[in-house]
């Protein structure tokens, strides 16, 4: 029983310490689901984002827990505003990192449909980032894929 309490306490600490990360992951998941095709490739990109953006070393188990928490959070929300509010508070480099991974997710199926492009424009607007920056990041990812 004590072990169960300690385990639950550890899970709460993981979630409490990573609220902003969970919201960023939820935004990525939302983008992945916008074309109604949430693939393993997109999940892999999101897990890579967790590893890159985490402030401390996380083991695979913690990464999966964060991913599951974010998926649950994304399912229960009907708008992106709460996710972008967290990202908007962050520095420019973090915002660029989020945009980069959003584009990696969107372009993971080699195309960007109207809904995905509209989502990216909305996100850039909510984060007060110019479309030009988003376009440059998108082109960099396309060039990287074509190497």
Per-segment meaning from a language model:
Residues 1-33, 37-147:
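Small-residue-enriched hydrophobic alpha-helices in membranes
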């Amino acid at each position: 029983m004590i072990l169960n309490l300690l385990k639950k306490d550890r899970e709460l600490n993981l979630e409490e310490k990573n609220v902003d990360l969970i919201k960023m992951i939820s935004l990525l998941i939302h983008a992945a689901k916008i074309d109604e095709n949430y693939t393993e490739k997109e999940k892999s990109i999101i897990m890579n984002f967790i590893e890159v953006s985490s402030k401390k070393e996380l083991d695979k188990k913690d990464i999966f827990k964060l991913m599951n928490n974010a998926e649950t959070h994304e399912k229960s929300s009907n708008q992106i505003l709460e996710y972008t509010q967290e990202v908007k508070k962050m520095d420019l480099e973090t915002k660029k990192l989020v945009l980069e991974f959003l584009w990696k997710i969107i372009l993971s199926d080699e195309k960007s449909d109207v809904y995905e492009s509209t989502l990216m424009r909305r996100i850039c607007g909510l984060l007060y980032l110019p479309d030009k920056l988003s376009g440059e990041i998108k082109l960099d990812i396309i060039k990287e894929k074509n190497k």
